[in-house]
From Swiss-Prot:
The gene is COX4I2. CDD domains: Cyt_c_Oxidase_IV (cd00922). The chain crosses the membrane at residues 101-126. This is Cytochrome c oxidase subunit 4 isoform 2, mitochondrial. Residues 29-100 are mitochondrial matrix. It comes from Homo sapiens. Component of the cytochrome c oxidase (complex IV, CIV), a multisubunit enzyme composed of 14 subunits. The complex is composed of a catalytic core of 3 subunits MT-CO1, MT-CO2 and MT-CO3, encoded in the mitochondrial DNA, and 11 supernumerary subunits COX4I1 (or COX4I2), COX5A, COX5B, COX6A1 (or COX6A2), COX6B1 (or COX6B2), COX6C, COX7A2 (or COX7A1), COX7B, COX7C, COX8A and NDUFA4, which are encoded in the nuclear genome.
Amino acid sequence: MLPRAAWSLVLRKGGGGRRGMHSSEGTTRGGGKMSPYTNCYAQRYYPMPEEPFCTELNAEEQALKEKEKGSWTQLTHAEKVALYRLQFNETFAEMNRRSNEWKTVMGCVFFFIGFAALVIWWQRVYVFPPKPITLTDERKAQQLQRMLDMKVNPVQGLASRWDYEKKQWKK
C-alpha cells in the first residue's frame, strides 16, 4: 500500500512535491492565473470553503469590498446579498434544495426493466422450444389419475388423501 501511495504522489500531474490547484496554499498548476470562479464546492456539512467563490473582482465589486470593511449598518440588503454571493456560491436553501435526479434514475430503471421484458418475450416466442405436451392440463390430469391408480405413497402422501370407494378426495 505504501509503495503504491508513493508512486501515485510521484507520478501524478504537477510533479512530485508540487501542490496542485486544490491545495491550502492556493497555488495553481503551471503558475497561471486562477479562473474568476474557483472550484470551491460548499456543502451543508462544510459550508465555509477555504477560497472565496469569486476571486477576480471588477471595480464595482472592489468598491463593495472596501465598503464592507466599514460599518455593516450602512450596507443595504442588496449590497449584503452581493457580498454574500462574492464569497459563496449557494445559500443553505439552495444547497438543501432537492434535485430532480430521482426522475432520471427511475426513468432509466423502468427503461431497463422494459427492455429486459422485451428480451424475455422475444426469447419465449423465437428462441425457446415449444412446451412439451406433458405440460397440458389434460396430460397433468392423466398423470394424477395414474399416480392414484398405482397408489403412490399410501401412508402419508397423495394416495392417503384419495377415497378409492367414492372416487373423490377425502374431506
